[in-house]
């Protein structure tokens, strides 16, 4: 089933602390807690999004005197460390409450630690700080409660708000539907690192989704491989409130972006996840099942030109319940058997005893460096 992280509607701003406002907040919180409290899917109630982190480290304090800072922060603690937890305690049967996301603990001063050994993290090194996708592996917290990457919606959606003369991501109309000041630049930068950057407008829209899907697939698989140390991965974001370039996996019209397909696969109850470490390919099996499962693992190294199998391995395995396990590994040089990394793909298949199949493909080189054969296919 689906568990819900239920935010109160406070985000990225400091709020008043006068008695009238606090009473208004209290009554609204009571109404909504009573409205939602009987839903068994609610995992926790969170006071706000990113206010603790912002007040600590985003430079918000600089324009205020020490006295003003103390007054503003008292208003903050009155709402999120006193009023809201009191409402939760009174009107629920012991539901969990988290004052702000991200934090390292529930007390005042328990600011986010990166990467965290406790609490939750918002990891935006990939995107805002221009970390490479591989950095996800080096930034593992206990619960990654926000991470994401932008893409454009598909061409069919873009046609809803553009004319032919607008078919440029830097056009006035396209810019109006891109509300991140660094959005187009980041997409181009990252695309240049991993893919060939297309000049065609439609291909750029498409490749932005491929890029986003790759980023989020790596993130989701990384977080799951580190189970049980990391036990949460919340993707920003699911959908849109208008047709726009954004971090969503479904656009305003509900059309799935490439990322959404990978989300379904990456969050399946069983995940087969290959990764290269120290010139060795490791195959992880990640299970959310409460019982162990047995089946057959097949690892196949295929030439991209279609001229046969380079290496194939088959093994009967048992996947332990509710954890992540390295189930198979092999030196990359042995896998290649004299072939170049750019000429092959590693296809991994796990088939359980019921016949259900879980697959993944792993490339040993960047996509822009792969030697894909020109099949002269016309679609």
List each model region and its residues:
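Beta-strand-rich binding/interaction modules
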Residues: 281-329, 340-351
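Terminal connector regions
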Residues: 295, 332-375
């Amino acid at each position: 089933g689906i568990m819900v992280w239920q935010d109160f509607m406070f985000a990225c701003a400091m709020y008043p602390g006068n008695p009238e406002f606090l009473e208004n907040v209290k009554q609204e919180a009571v109404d909504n807690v009573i409205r939602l409290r009987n839903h068994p899917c609610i995992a926790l109630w969170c006071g706000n999004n990113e206010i603790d982190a912002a007040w600590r480290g985003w430079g918000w304090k600089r324009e205020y005197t020490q006295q003003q800072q103390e007054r503003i922060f008292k208003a903050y603690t009155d709402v999120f460390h006193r009023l809201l937890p009191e409402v939760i305690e009174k009107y629920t049967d012991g539901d969990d409450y988290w004052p702000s996301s991200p934090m390292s603990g529930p007390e005042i001063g328990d600011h986010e630690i990166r990467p965290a050994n406790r609490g939750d993290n918002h990891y935006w090194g990939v995107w805002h700080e221009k970390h490479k996708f591989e950095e996800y592996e080096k930034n593992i917290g206990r619960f990654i409660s926000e991470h994401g990457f932008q893409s454009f919606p598909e061409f069919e959606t873009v046609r809803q708000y553009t004319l032919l003369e607008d078919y440029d991501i830097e056009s006035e109309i396209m810019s109006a539907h891109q509300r991140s000041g660094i959005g187009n630049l980041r997409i181009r930068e990252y695309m240049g690192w991993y893919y060939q950057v297309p000049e065609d407008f439609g291909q750029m829209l498409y490749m932005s989704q491929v890029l986003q899907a790759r980023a989020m697939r790596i993130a989701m698989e990384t977080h799951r491989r580190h189970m049980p140390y990391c036990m949460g991965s919340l993707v920003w974001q699911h959908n849109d409130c208008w047709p726009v370039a954004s971090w969503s996996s479904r656009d305003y019209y509900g059309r799935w972006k490439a990322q959404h397909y990978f989300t379904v696969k990456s969050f399946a109850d069983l995940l087969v996840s290959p990764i290269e470490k120290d010139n060795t390919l490791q195959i992880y099996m990640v299970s959310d099942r409460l019982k162990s499962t047995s089946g057959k693992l097949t690892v196949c190294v295929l030439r991209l030109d279609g001229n046969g199998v380079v290496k194939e391995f088959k093994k009967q395995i048992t996947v332990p319940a509710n954890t992540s396990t390295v189930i198979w590994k092999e030196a990359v040089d042995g896998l290649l058997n004299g072939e170049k990394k750019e000429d092959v793909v590693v296809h991994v298949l796990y088939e359980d005893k019921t016949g259900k199949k879980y697959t993944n493909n792993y490339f040993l080189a960047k996509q822009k460096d792969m030697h894909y054969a020109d099949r002269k296919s016309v679609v």
